[in-house]
């Protein structure tokens, strides 16, 4: 049964107390109206217990914002949620529309640093987060008498003439009274030849989850700093500090130990506020994990990023013989749970 305001309620008890379920929780759809954001569609989801998040069909069904009782879970950048028409796929152009948010998807043909591969140029993190969705549907319904489901689903396609034809369907779901959400992806190669498939969930936690009073808790059995800068503070990868102008980003590659159910749970906990956020995902789907730690003023964010391949360029992955391929007609699924603690 849904738990609202500290009490469990049956379906009938809730029906008697409101004219429609939207009074308690549900989805509102609207478009942003100004500047680079004009025309961006948002599905604003409320679960009824203070947990709220925004899914953007215009931006790969990614999660542009999330909060709990008015406290943000994620970092939002200065770019805003730019309309995908402004996407610049060359070099670092991806950053001009990187709004942060609770989830930005990287892939699907490439991710990591810009590169050249077989005469093709691939920009930073590829175009997944800039793919607009079609067949967008909203579900708000009871599953029996015990669970009221709230979900948004849409389908994106990464394709071109003489190129890949990949269909990607995403469902973002929660339930009335919940303090977490579930992202489920189904990716199908509808072409007739194999194609690369790399996917990384760029989950961007921000203030007040991220603060000088926060710690990162994760089942990391090995931490490999990306470079010399990260190596200088590798011993304190799990501690955060106050934001300061000019601090460089630090990235760490973790080897995670899944639990008895094959799941990995990572979380950030603000010890002073006794408030935080978590992610949980199947290790078999995402055997690689990157931590993006930046305490630069204005870019105060800690990214927790599971992926299906090492985080490096497509060209490097190919050279390492580590580039995942999706065969013609093959389907692959990925999922993650994100929520409040």
Regions of interest found by a model, annotated:
Residues 1-182, 194, 205-242, 257-340:
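Surface-exposed acidic/polar loop and edge beta-strand patches at domain peripheries
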Residues 247-261:
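An ectodomain-focused feature that recognizes extracytoplasmic/extracellular
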Residues 190-192:
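Short, acidic/polar linear motifs in exposed loop/turn regions
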Residues 201, 251-254, 289:
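Aromatic side chains
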Residues 199-205:
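Surface-exposed beta-strand/loop patches in extracellular or lumenal glycoproteins
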